[in-house]
């Protein structure tokens, strides 16, 4: 029975036996290919194995099989997150530099669509910022700057404490960006903004000490 196979697959995933779980999910799909949610489970299992290429392939099958009304910004976001995971993977053997760059470019494209589909949410722009930061790890080109600035403006307009950690991320990037540009007054403004939220923030304190 396909239900038994899918249940067994879920059990194996819970036991962190991801390779075996993928086999059982595959058996269930062979018996009933309308169980599109199983592609998501297969994707999750591959991700837990740090096999992002297979995770992305499985998730794309899941997403493509969804009815139009289920293709929400949230389901699309997960695809972008997988591309981001591949692009920032610490496994240099599994992910080659060319694949890493392509994955980050794909992540940026997906998060752009998320932003367009959910313009009132900051998450699409935040993940565009993170993705562009990963493409510019030394912050030499400031690729993430416009996205962090946009997120900052969006969150300041909401004026809610639950966004403080995201604001600190924005301020940290911008503070470092202006520090590299030797624009010390502007850099100090951002580090002080962090301390206004979190007076014990060690990174901000260290940056300000260095500017002095």
Indicate residue ranges for each PLM-predicted region.
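Residue-level recognition of tetratricopeptide repeat
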Residues: 10, 44-47, 81, 85-88, ...
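Short, small-residue-biased leader/transition segments that mark boundaries at the very start
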Residues: 1-3
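Short coil turns that delineate tetratricopeptide repeat
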Residues: 33, 67-70, 119-120, 199
């Amino acid at each position: 029975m396909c239900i038994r196979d899918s249940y067994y697959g879920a059990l194996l995933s819970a036991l962190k036996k991801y390779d075996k779980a993928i086999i059982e999910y595959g058996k269930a799909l062979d018996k009933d290919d309308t169980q599109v949610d199983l592609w998501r489970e297969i994707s999750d299992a591959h991700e837990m194995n740090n096999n992002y290429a297979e995770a992305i392939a499985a998730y794309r099958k899941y997403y493509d099989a969804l009815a139009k009304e289920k293709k929400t910004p949230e389901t699309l976001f997960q695809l972008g997150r997988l591309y981001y995971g591949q692009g920032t993977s610490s496994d240099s053997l599994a992910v080659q530099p060319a694949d890493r760059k392509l994955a980050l470019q794909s992540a940026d494209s997906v998060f752009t669509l998320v932003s367009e589909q959910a313009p009132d949410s900051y998450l699409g722009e935040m993940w565009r910022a993170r993705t562009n930061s990963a493409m510019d790890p030394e912050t030499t080109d400031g690729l993430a700057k416009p996205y962090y600035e946009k997120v900052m403006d969006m969150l300041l307009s909401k004026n809610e404490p639950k966004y403080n950690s995201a604001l600190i991320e924005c301020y940290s990037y911008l503070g470092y960006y202006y520090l590299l540009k030797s624009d010390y007054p502007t850099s100090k403004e951002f580090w002080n903004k962090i301390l206004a939220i979190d007076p014990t923030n060690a990174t901000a304190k260290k940056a300000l000490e260095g500017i002095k």
